[in-house]
A protein has these predicted regions:
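Short loop segments at secondary-structure junctions
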Residues: 12-13, 65-66, 102
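Short, well-ordered beta-strand segments in beta-rich or mixed alpha/beta enzyme
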Residues: 2-9, 39-75
């Protein structure tokens, strides 16, 4: 299994716009062969100093894939290219962390 933690930083005030485009793309991604989990998450509230918040312009995509082949196919899927084109002017940065369980 391959896990992905993608940290997406939207341009100021654009997170909800990016999330709307992301959510529209979720059904196509979840239908991909090898997709086990794919969804967004934002800072939880109510944890005080226990939590290091990412901020109002950031969301994280939590993904699980059966194997590297499935993730590589996802990266070049046409719906991902369309999502990238729709959101390119709204995203300030992204950091993709690809992880293997130990």
């Amino acid at each position: 299994m391959i896990r992905v933690v993608a940290v997406i930083t939207a341009k100021p005030g654009r997170r909800e716009d990016v999330l709307a485009a992301f959510r529209a793309n979720v059904p196509a991604v979840r239908a991909e062969a090898g997709c086990l989990e794919y969804g967004p998450a934002v800072d939880a509230e109510g944890f005080g100093s226990f939590q290091a918040k990412m901020g109002p312009d950031v969301f994280v995509v939590l993904e699980s894939w059966e194997n590297a082949q499935a993730l590589k196919a996802h990266a070049v899927a046409p719906h991902m290219a369309a999502y990238a084109a729709r959101t390119k002017d709204m995203i300030a940065s992204r950091a993709i962390h690809i992880l293997s369980p130990v």
